Amino acid sequence: MDIIDNVDITLPENGEDIVIVGGRRYDYNGDLAKFKAFKVAKHIWVVPGRYYGEKLDIQDGEKINGGIYDKDFLSQNQEKQEFMDGVILLLKRINNTLEGKRLLSLITSAVPFPNEDDGIYKQNNFILSDKTFKAYTSNIIIFGPGANLVENKVIAFNSGDAENGLGTISEICFQPLLTYKFGDYFQDPALDLLKCLIKSLYYLYGIKVPEDFTLPYRLTNNPDKTEYSQVNMEDLLISGGDDLNAAGQRPYWLWNNYFIDAKDKFDKYKEIYENQMKLDPNLEINLSNHLEQKFNINISELWSLNISNFARTFNLKSPRSFYKALKYYYRKKYYKIHYNEIFGTNYNIYGFIDGQVNASLKETDLNIINKPQQIINLIDNNNILLIKSYIYDDELNKIDYNFYNNYEIPYNYGNSFKIPNITGILLPSVNYELIDKIPKIAEIKPYIKDSTPLPDSEKTPIPKELNVGIPLPIHYLDSQIYKGDEDKDFILSPDFLKVVSTKDKSLVYSFLPNIVSYFDGYDKTKISTDKKYYLWIREVLNNYSIDITRTENIIGIFGVDEIVPWMGRALNILNTENTFETELRKNGLKALLSKDLNVIFPKTKVDPIPTDNPPLTIEKIDEKLSDIYIKNKFFLIKNYYITIQQWWICCYSQFLNLSYMCREAIINQQNLIEKIILNQLSYLARETSINIETLYILSVTTEKTIEDLREISQKSMNNICNFFERASVSIFHTDIYNKFIDHMKYIVDDANTKIINYINSNSNITQEEKNYLINKYMLTEEDFNFFNFDKLINLFNSKIQLTIKNEKPEYNLLLSINQNESNENITDISGNNVKISYSNNINILDGRNEQAIYLDNDSQYVDFKSKNFENGVTNNFTISFWMRTLEKVDTNSTLLTSKLNENSAGWQLDLRRNGLVWSMKDHNKNEINIYLNDFLDISWHYIVVSVNRLTNILTVYIDGELSVNRNIEEIYNLYSDVGTIKLQASGSKVRIESFSILNRDIQRDEVSNRYINYIDNVNLRNIYGERLEYNKEYEVSNYVYPRNLLYKVNDIYLAIERGSNSSNRFKLILININEDKKFVQQKDIVIIKDVTQNKYLGISEDSNKIKLVDRNNALELILDNHLLNPNYTTFSTKQEEYLRLSNIDGIYNWVIKDVSRLNDIYSWTLI
């Protein structure tokens, strides 16, 4: 779609694409609105000013929590210009993808249905010039925000037409200059605009979702009464994500007629257009062409448009939960976006210039309204205020009754429709190229229709204030926040009451015992050197890791095998003199809930079966009962998923709330630790004589440690989510599902009674036939036993990311090595986008399992560069790879290094004396060298080096076995700002395969499993671990005599070689008889050819010896590998007879065929 660029908002009206508009709707003063509009694309207009329908100078009582109000916003031309630039850039960004092009083109063609008036077709989608009264086609108008600067919304010009299928113009209130954060990333404003555009499409098509089509969402946190949030179906559809997926899993709430009615309206007007209007010569051709494209789609394609799908299309991060509900968990801060050079651009057509996570945006200085739902005062026995805390709620509407109280599940409805779950290309029916070629509708004939009055602003409720004597979780959370001066130190205390009772702001609550103990008596003046700092920061991180990631096994609670013991101390949950585990066992998981479960089984009624008149044959009765049986089973499933919905609302949402509280607790503790660390670093910079260069190393190393701190926090959060997910499903099983089963028995009895009565009422079938039908169509308990623990866990995934950092990919580097006809290709597939460079003469050859890098001279290298390789004091890592040296290693040569030069800090792996040397050197010149001698034997070996900087343990594994377990506490800071790892050979001939670097350490079991997974595959191998190939020459030895090769006796029989200089060695090639392939695999059927003679392996029937025969008598053999040694192969016939060595017969051990028990003498290796 063509989008006009570089629009100057100071240009005067020109009667084409700049128009002074007025006369269609009244503003907040009751006057006809007037504004200056700019056409930026076909049928799309932008107004660089505030929305006319809302009063900008509003009273405090009308301001909503989290809103920003400034009547002067967009009053200056410079600000208006940036608004215009921002909207145009966002439209161009959307238009820069295939799905975005389709969406914008569809918006331009989706003109509201015209009104026929005495043979003239008139449109209601227009703006009107205030001077000439000329009408201009407009499907959407994008304004600046209304009173609330951060409230994006879409207003239908006529709300009736927005729902009745005719369609109406949309007015969008939009804020492109401010954004906010979810977790560690900024919300891309393109997604916010897309949300408005999708809603506009609903209005243009006339399929707006009714306001009363709502679903209960969750229990609120109102301590006074039981209250539910409810979500409008339109918002849920457009947001997408986990909530829509969960609601759409089994959408048996769809007895609301919206989806069916919307499709009927679409089909109605489509039929009118195609059968009447399209044939009328009075219909303007461009209007007709746009209508044709409007109706060319499947209406369900509109319901697949949601923010989650577009985020996937744009490769953007986006919340998986409903936006408005998230406001309960995230107190938004807003940040400025700049689209032009004047303020310093930080956003372009590809999104944030530095990415969603690393974007450099300044926080706005505009005041954000703070209106909590409740103020909870914790008071002591003397009514003295200890701490004041605020409870906020989501932006959803509330109901104070149970949605399911008067609810009846329909028996005959909601059985077929399902919300489309599109994961491929969106809007596949839209031909944007064709639409864009259709000229704009120029000669518009306006149809004047009254607009829907704009709603008045509502008064926001005054926060309720409540005094409590028992601390709530919110009080515990607030006590963990340091509220003193930024440059002051503070003390961590495990005593909550002491913290809230004192007026000393330097006292902060911590529930982490090891951390509190470690900092007890902490004196930053004693940490005065870099070495002491390194030791100290490592211990801080280690204690934090022990405390925050700690879990305990628990037995006896269904579905829950681990608990997180600190959550009781963090939130005052189940806190008595007993431990968290003891209280949990004593009171059960339900004790974690603040509101009682209130699951109501809706009214259910199985419809009676109509009596047949005249009576049916047994075949017809069977057919009828089959339909009823399916309907009955479906009715049971509907009851099950309605029960699940209630469980989500009443139970799961409470656990989700606790999860977010635990998230806040983790973040609070993390922030405290970070502040202590940074204060200590600041002290070293101010008060000690440490030189500038060392201070720089200390600073960047600290950044790496803080990254580790945040990763540890995320691991703790994952433990929390896992516990609450399993706890919620456990409650469903133990407290809800059994009641559901009892309820189902009542329904089943009712349904079965109706089936029996119906069958017995048929007098034209025999009793035997009646019994047959009763047994066939009676429902049993198996028909409603739906519970599946794992499926229920997967249905609702509550994994929560912390606000600071998302989890990194597991691998810092995961190498992919490929070779095609034109070049070699070495890439990183870890997700970290590691920069890789390598010499032009690098070789890629077949490796053990995959393709391998082959290094055979000093000029060859592969460099890996990433900030993840800038190891510091606390960064754990694991290096693993397969390697094969192709010759004896006599001299020292470097294979792998993170060091810039010999004197640099870092680690290094050298080849030496047919072995390896692992070395580490820190910035304080401390160094270790670990020797692994004499194991390289030109075979493939699996090498793993794992470093845990918190436990100070280095482990090295060779072929899955532990070879080194070494304490490395004398090694401090390994930081290198080069961030480069070099792979080289320095004179040795080496193949490297499956090279990877993990961002953590690994233990013996994981190493062993990885090794087994590598070797346990279908490929057969030679003595060195290389894959066997067809049509390649090999010599053969036996497992029992590995040094003795097979040779030919009289050029007829095969036996073990006697003497090392035999001139008649047996050399073979393997030939696959069924298919043409390169590598030999398990269960392949082959014949074996003698290389020196045109002969093949056969059998001498008289002696059972293997002999050389012609092609027609060649023995077909099945190949397999040795169970314990993958480099050895077995040869067997289809009769399960194996080739083996005979017992010594004179001077020979013959190769024979035998059926006795398989053992080592049946195993052969090819060389």
Curated annotation (Swiss-Prot):
Gene3D superfamilies xrefs: 2.60.120.200, 2.80.10.50, Clostridium botulinum neurotoxin b, 'coiled-coil' domain, Metalloproteases ('zincins'), catalytic domain like
Ranges for region Light chain nLC: 1-381
GO molecular function: metalloendopeptidase activity; toxin activity; zinc ion binding
Region C-heavy chain nHC, residue ranges: 805-1167
Keywords tagged on the record: Plasmid, Virulence
BP terms from Gene Ontology: proteolysis
N-heavy chain nHN: region residues: 382-804
SUPFAM superfamilies membership: Clostridium neurotoxins, 'coiled-coil' domain, Concanavalin A-like lectins/glucanases, Metalloproteases ('zincins'), catalytic domain
Function: Expression of the ptox operon (ntnh-orfX1-orfX2-orfX3-pmp1) in B.thuringiensis kills Anopheles but not Aedes mosquito 3rd instar larvae. The ntnh-pmp1 construct is about half as toxic.
UniProt free text on domains: Has 3 domains that are structurally very similar to those in PMP1; light chain (nLC, equivalent to the light chain), N-heavy chain (nHN) and C-heavy chain (nHC).
Family to which the UniProt record says this protein belongs: Belongs to the botulism non-toxic nonhemagglutinin family.
Additional remark text: P.bifermentans strain Cbm (subsp. malaysia) is toxic to Anopheles mosquito 3rd instar larvae and less toxic to Aedes aegypti larvae. The presence of 4 plasmids, including this one, is required to kill mosquito larvae.
UniProt-recorded name of the protein: Non-toxic nonhemagglutinin
Gene it is expressed from: ntnh
